[in-house]
Every structure is written in C-alpha cells, then in structure tokens.
A protein has these predicted regions:
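Glycine-rich anion/phosphate-binding loops
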Residues: 77-91
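Conserved small/polar residues in nucleotide/adenosyl-binding loops
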Residues: 137-144
C-alpha cells in the first residue's frame, strides 16, 4: 500500500518553527506500506522556519473557493503558497497511486477536522486545512473520504 504522509510526522524538520512532529505510530506504517513524504508548505515555496500561519475567514474549503485566506501572524498573505503546496500534494498523491494519506493535525495545510481559528490565540475550530480540503474535494467517492484519528505524539 502506498501512503502519502506529512513529512514532519516522519521526523523531517519542516514545521513552521523548524522542528518536526515525529510520530512513532506513523513511522511504524513503513513496515506495511510505502511512505511518500510531502510537506505542502515547503512545496508551496515557504521557507523553514517560517512565521506561523492560520486560515482567516473560514477553512480549507473556503480557501479553495477564494472566500478565505491563509495569513501569517505578522499579517502576510501566504494563500498562494498554500494553494500551490496543496496542488503539489494532490499531484504526488495521484501520480504515486497512493491509496491513503496521513496528515498532520491542526495544520493550516494538513489539518483534518480541527484547525486553528485564524485569531492566533490557540483556539481550535471545526474545519480542514487547505491540502486536506483539496484531497477530499478530489476524492473519487464519499466512501474514500473516511477520516481516522491517530493518537498524537506530544
């Protein structure tokens, strides 16, 4: 089985703060799957480290619809970079033949179900990140849109 996975979950130091989000449960998937790492934010041209960013005015679906933006904490609009990264992740997923995707929780790119609310206050709201929304939007059928949660590593 081929699985596209957020690179930070594999220990790649590509988080906004220059760190990683290494997750042993995700890493163990390599025993039964071919893991294909991707960092949509770096693929979109953003540096590491970079200022924190959140979706302002909605969620990933709203960004795809042009109704919300991804902004950094210092007020820079990075929406285009997030869109570019999402489309890159989609291309990697499709061209690799991946059947599953494991993405970083709460990220403005990869969040699934919960993202930060755009106020930079640490408050969560329901919604998906831009990459997650892009992948779900292009999913061939509703049965493929199953969400599962993996325990987060601290």
């Amino acid at each position: 089985m081929k699985v596209v996975i957020s690179a930070c979950l594999l220990g790649v130091r590509c988080r906004y703060d220059g760190g990683d989000s290494r997750n042993e449960i995700a890493i163990e998937q390599k025993e039964t799957s071919e893991l294909i790492p991707v960092c949509p934010e770096e693929a979109g041209g953003l540096p590491t480290p970079r200022p924190p960013a959140e979706i302002v005015g909605g969620d990933g679906d709203a960004v795809l619809d042009g109704k919300a933006k991804v902004m950094t904490a210092d007020g820079v609009d990075v929406t285009e970079a997030y869109l570019k990264g999402a489309y890159h992740a989609l291309q990697v997923t499709q061209s690799s033949g991946a059947t599953h995707v494991i993405l970083k929780a709460r990220s403005p790119s990869c969040g699934c179900g919960d993202i930060y609310d755009g106020t930079f206050s640490g408050t969560l709201t329901s919604g998906d990140g831009v990459t997650t929304a892009c992948l779900l939007y292009t999913s061939p059928s509703p049965r493929d849109r199953t969400r599962s949660r993996m325990p987060s590593s601290a």
